[in-house]
Amino acid sequence: MDNYTRAYVLGKLRFKAPKEIDYDELKTGINNLNATQNFSRISYSLEPKDNGNELKINLSENENKTFLKFGLHYDGLYKSAILVNVTHKKSMFKNDVLSMDLALGDNIRYNLDYYIDNGFYWSFGIKSRFNEFNRNVKTDFNDGTLFEQTGLNSLNMDFSDLTNQIYVQTVFIQKYLIGAGLEHKYLRIETENLEENSRVFENSTYISAFGYLKYDSFDNRYFPKNGWLFSGDIQSFLYSSDYTKEFDRFSIAKGEIGFAKNFAKKWTLKIQSEAGFSFGNESVDFFDFVLGGYGNQTINNFKHFLGYDFLIISGDSFIK
């Protein structure tokens, strides 16, 4: 291969040689390899050997390196936007991918990802994103104290979040994704509902360290019929420029677990739950768990909760 390493291919197949595998493992590995869209042709053969069959895989690399996509988006939080995605492969190294998502509309957003995929070896990534929105919310990020003092029951809030991450991750025992990294975050929250000297709630920079573990055997991302899902991460906030003069070091743990089982041709049972809590010193209210709304992507500790409006329930712990 000219543009991909052996470690990259084995990482996508999720098995190492020499190893005995069954047909389901082979099928899953080939599907994973095909999903990368890095190969225009994938074929394999089994050649008899003294102690079994030897698997040989033939790959034809896709010559396309750059992809441009457009889309339209609307939700109740970010409103309408034109979406632009640019993805370029092999920018500097054989196994790297650079992706840029840009949302142009009522609230400008971007998401930048650069990832060097080394398969079963340690892989390296850089992420940067910016999110902003304006919305009437029924949380004051202060346990309701501000609402009690002012007599208000909602705030028109301008929210801005710039987050940058560097991280490493690998596949452990060919099943579990583990990783760790450092995060820089700039957070600004303000409102026009209050007096001039009280309009800015937050205007701080934060430095934190994080680690995570993920396992996903669902056979379909959105409508699984069989499999398990587990995801857990811990983030420790180590430093803040401390605009509010209330910062102490603290940590946040979050987890998600799910199970799906197909019982009949058209019947599947799916059970899923997630929870989170803070520990250590008293947490910063702006990193509380805030539930409500819908969508595919979330930031910070915002969590979807169908049946409730966006950003309507908040607390330093939750389970659903």
Where are these regions (language model features)?
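Hydrophobic transmembrane signal anchors and adjacent membrane-proximal interface regions, especially
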Residues: F15, N53-L55, E202, D248, ...
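Gram-negative/organellar outer-membrane beta-barrel architecture
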Residues: K19-E25, G29-F218, Y222, Q297-G307, ...
